[in-house]
């Protein structure tokens, strides 16, 4: 790829960031499509996010991806949010139109698209959702929009717990889905929820390096063959949760599916062009 002065910059702002496959995936897609953009990752956390956004405007970047820990904070720095992003309370994509910043969340649409592509219909189903960060709430919001019946969200009593309660209130008021929020330490409630669930989704960083030997499922007998287990973590590709699920006979969807489909939507928002899906799946080794 020969980068010229006509190229525009697209970023990814997160911390940590060096594990991300997004720069490789997006740059392969941009090169294949012959588009004058380059995509770069920047280590940005909550303490430097405001100045990074000022830099984005000053450099006239086309936009940026946003990942942990900035997804919720980023909502405060854009001029406009999509209805879905408002429901989530977090964004993973910013598009810069001559200094006017629009915030989107493609995490939810990407993850639900991966589920649908597997042939699973979420309508009328019940999901146990682990986590209450930007990715988890995006998945929950999109699932609610697309007709899931009930979401049982479990999260530790940390800084995200009250945000999870507020998220549940927004979804309950604006969709037909019923969302409950429970402390993950309540193992009795967790066991009961899994017993009646159709889908278990990990929206936390548990399983991601350096937590690759950890899983929020302590008792593998809670996993039933009829349960669909989905993962947001893609590094490592086969998380401990997915290993447990496969051993229990569950159908699984790995984190590559969400990465691929959310990235495809981001690409189209930034460039206005179709994402070269089949090519990217091939060169990245994705099976989604």
UniProtKB/Swiss-Prot annotation:
Q: What chemistry does it catalyse, as a reaction equation? A: L-quinate + NAD(+) = 3-dehydroquinate + NADH + H(+); L-quinate + NADP(+) = 3-dehydroquinate + NADPH + H(+); shikimate + NADP(+) = 3-dehydroshikimate + NADPH + H(+); shikimate + NAD(+) = 3-dehydroshikimate + NADH + H(+)
Which controlled-vocabulary keywords does the entry list? Amino-acid biosynthesis, Aromatic amino acid biosynthesis, NAD, NADP, Oxidoreductase
Q: Which residues bind substrate?
A: 71, 107
Q: Which residues bind NAD(+)?
A: 132-135, 155-158, 205, 232-235, 255
NCBIfam families in the record, alphabetically? PRK12749.1
Q: Which family does it belong to?
A: Belongs to the shikimate dehydrogenase family.
Give the protein's recorded name: Quinate/shikimate dehydrogenase
């Amino acid at each position: 790829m020969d980068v010229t002065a006509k190229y525009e910059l697209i970023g990814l702002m997160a911390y940590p960031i060096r594990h991300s496959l997004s720069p490789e995936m997006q740059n392969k897609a941009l090169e294949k499509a012959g588009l004058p953009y380059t995509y770069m990752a920047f280590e940005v956390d909550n303490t430097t996010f405001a100045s990074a956004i000022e830099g984005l405007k000053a450099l006239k970047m086309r936009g940026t991806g946003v990942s942990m820990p900035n997804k919720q904070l980023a909502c405060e720095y854009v001029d406009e949010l999509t209805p879905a992003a408002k429901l989530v309370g977090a964004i993973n994509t910013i598009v810069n139109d001559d200094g006017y910043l629009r915030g989107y969340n493609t995490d939810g649409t990407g993850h639900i698209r991966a589920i649908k592509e597997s042939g699973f219909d979420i309508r009328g189903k019940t999901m146990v959702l682990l986590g209450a960060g930007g990715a988890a709430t995006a998945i929950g919001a999109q699932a609610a929009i697309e007709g899931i019946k009930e979401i049982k969200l479990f999260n530790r009593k940390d800084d995200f717990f009250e945000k999870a309660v507020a998220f549940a209130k927004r979804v309950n008021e604006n969709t037909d889905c019923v969302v409950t929020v429970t402390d993950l330490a309540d193992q009795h409630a967790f066991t009961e929820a899994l017993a009646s669930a159709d889908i278990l989704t990990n929206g936390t960083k548990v399983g991601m390096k350096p937590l690759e030997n950890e899983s929020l499922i302590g008792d593998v007998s809670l996993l039933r063959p009829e349960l669909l287990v989905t993962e947001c973590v893609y590094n490592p590709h086969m998380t401990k949760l997915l290993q447990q699920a496969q051993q229990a006979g569950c159908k699984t969807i790995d984190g590559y599916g969400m990465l691929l489909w959310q990235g495809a939507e981001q690409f189209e928002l930034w460039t206005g062009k179709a994402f070269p899906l089949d090519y990217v799946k091939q060169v990245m080794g994705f099976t989604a």
